[in-house]
Amino acid sequence: MGVTGILQLPRDRFKRTSFFLWVIILFQRTFSIPLGVIHNSTLQVSDVDKLVCRDKLSSTNQLRSVGLNLEGNGVATDVPSATKRWGFRSGVPPKVVNYEAGEWAENCYNLEIKKPDGSECLPAAPDGIRGFPRCRYVHKVSGTGPCAGDFAFHKEGAFFLYDRLASTVIYRGTTFAEGVVAFLILPQAKKDFFSSHPLREPVNATEDPSSGYYSTTIRYQATGFGTNETEYLFEVDNLTYVQLESRFTPQFLLQLNETRYTSGKRSNTTGKLIWKVNPEIDTTIGEWAFWETKKNLTRKIRSEELSFTAVSNRAKNISGQSPARTSSDPGTNTTTEDHKIMASENSSAMVQVHSQGREAAVSHLTTLATISTSLRPPITKPGPDNSTHNTPVYKLDISEATQVEQHHRRTDNASTTSDTPPATTAAGPLKAENTNTSKGTDLLDPATTTSPQNHSETAGNNNTHHQDTGEESASSGKLGLITNTIAGVAGLITGGRRTRREAIVNAQPKCNPNLHYWTTQDEGAAIGLAWIPYFGPAAEGIYIEGLMHNQDGLICGLRQLANETTQALQLFLRATTELRTFSILNRKAIDFLLQRWGGTCHILGPDCCIEPHDWTKNITDKIDQIIHDFVDKTLPDQGDNDNWWTGWRQWIPAGIGVTGVIIAVIALFCICKFVF
């Protein structure tokens, strides 16, 4: 009766009934009951999957390879410290692996080192290997070194991350970041996992900086690269340098570069001039949180003495540090100049010190700091030949200025010979002061500052800005481009303001809580385990933003797991390499033995005295540490089956599906009842 009645329905009622049936079918498919049958080919859920991944791996499409930067572990990123983690070695071929996703890197490196004879230390990058695409600061090091080996490897077993490729060696002139490669297991394979709008590079300096990407190149000169006596110089221009120290942050170096240009304290001769910073100077000036959109704002800086000592070339010859860096005048001898004359003694330039994007301690107050220059009496120091020479010490006093917001842009067409400061005052020349007088109190009149064109002339040969470094004022309040720490995700979505990055107290923390990923503010696209950027392969040269959502501590644990696993695998690699070498030597010995009937050591000599080391204890310790950190420690909401929520929440989808089916049956019954 029912079936016959349905078949005899009028056309309009049949359409209405069919519509309801399709709605019910779609509803049931959306909340379907899991009816799959587990068989032998189904991948089993391991303890690590339960504790860390919180899902089973049912398809390889759920795997995503991720490059994690070492700086997230809290390692030192300054050039003197970072280069100590690299070393040259021969006899080990390089290995290259690919990865799909990565992090924004605050510090990247680019090396161009030559041997004393002028030959290259590092190999050229093979076809297809490009520089790491997302670096806030690129530390470009040029110079010389002995380079005792064919390739430069990482002493701690990490990779050198390039654009979607990770290599075990450093390539010449190619930007890289230090890191490891790990794999994420996604809750379920989705083709649109990384779908979002592409990140477009800004084409000019007038675009909104919130849609652009910023990168700054900082140049250094090195002598004795790869040795314990390596010396580094921060390059202001081709002739002016500052002795580099581990305590110098990139932001401080940028301010230092700005100060050297605007105060006119650069070499005005044809020889090199080296400055040394007062060891009591606070080098955290200008430091700002990771990957905030850079704003060329000014902030209140406490009054302090910022002094530089000019180091004579007679006392320290640095002429041979870089064959690539020579004087513009080929007929000039750069090794015999004693450069004590930097600028005219009546120089009264007032310059700006930019905070490079970090908010002021008092968020609502922004000030323009000024530096007044004055000369101290020359200091007489004995030279290496027991002679004396005068070394001037320039005292730079920083004082408060009026509350202004500076909007000017920096371009790349810099002049390396101009000593014109980017900002001067018409309020009258500064009064010269000696070491016994109080600091200057002259203020900068914002109405009399020079135009941005003057600033562009002395922007500096050192720092190459791929994008305007200052577009927004201090009062704009707009958040960073598309980057934030995981701890600040809520602030990103709700529009809250970021706070300054806290100092890392422990020298070697287990994990840095301030992890920074390429993200998007589209909360609707959030799925998965962590905030991960995607470097392709949607289109060549176009980078896709992707959002993965997770609790704060999970990706931190994944990072540490990848780091410790990589170290253990590096020990395996070393043992395997030695075994391979040992086997080759044995093969050669056997070949010679069959031909010459001589003993192995008699034929090979000292080369036969090699044996593979036993790294079992080290590898076991690493594995035990991983088990202790991730298996023995239960993550939140991951208790045993006695936990009601943990044990029963897996039935929630099934319950919803059953409820949907019941509702569908009742609805169908009501429709039939209504029709008949």
Swiss-Prot record:
Residues the record marks as carrying a glycan: 40, 204, 228, 238, 257, 268, 296, 317, 333, 346, 386, 413, 436, 454, 462, 563, 618
Residue numbers marked as site, Cleavage: 501-502, 637-638
Site (Involved in receptor recognition and/or post-binding events): 57, 63-64, 88, 95, 170
Gene3D superfamilies tied to this protein: 1.10.287.210
Stretches the record annotates as Disordered: 314-337, 373-392, 402-479
Entry keywords, A to Z: Clathrin-mediated endocytosis of virus by host, Cleavage on pair of basic residues, Coiled coil, Disulfide bond, Fusion of virus membrane with host endosomal membrane, Fusion of virus membrane with host membrane, Glycoprotein, Host cell membrane, Host membrane, Host-virus interaction, Inhibition of host innate immune response by virus, Inhibition of host tetherin by virus, Lipoprotein, Membrane, Palmitate, Secreted, Signal, Transmembrane, Transmembrane helix, Viral attachment to host cell, Viral attachment to host entry receptor, Viral envelope protein, Viral immunoevasion, Viral penetration into host cytoplasm, Virion, Virus endocytosis by host, Virus entry into host cell
Record-annotated disulphide pairs: 53-609, 108-135, 121-147, 511-556, 601-608
Tree of life domain: Viruses
Stretches that traverse the bilayer: 651-671
An annotated GO BP: symbiont-mediated suppression of host innate immune response
Topology feature Cytoplasmic, residues: 672-676
Post-translational modification: The signal peptide region modulates GP's high mannose glycosylation, thereby determining the efficiency of the interactions with DC-SIGN(R).
Region feature Receptor-binding, mapped onto this chain: 54-201
Region annotation (Fusion peptide) ranges: 524-539
CDD domains registered for this protein in UniProt: Ebola-like_HR1-HR2
Region (Mucin-like region): 305-485
Biased composition (Low complexity): 414-427
Covalently lipidated residues, kind S-palmitoyl cysteine: 670, 672
GO CC annotation terms, alphabetical: extracellular region; host cell plasma membrane; membrane; viral envelope; virion membrane
Chain intervals with Polar residues compositional bias: 314-335, 447-464
Family: Belongs to the filoviruses glycoprotein family.
Domain notes: The mucin-like region seems to be involved in the cytotoxic function. This region is also involved in binding to human CLEC10A.
Protein name: Envelope glycoprotein
Natural source organism: Zaire ebolavirus (strain Gabon-94)
Gene: GP
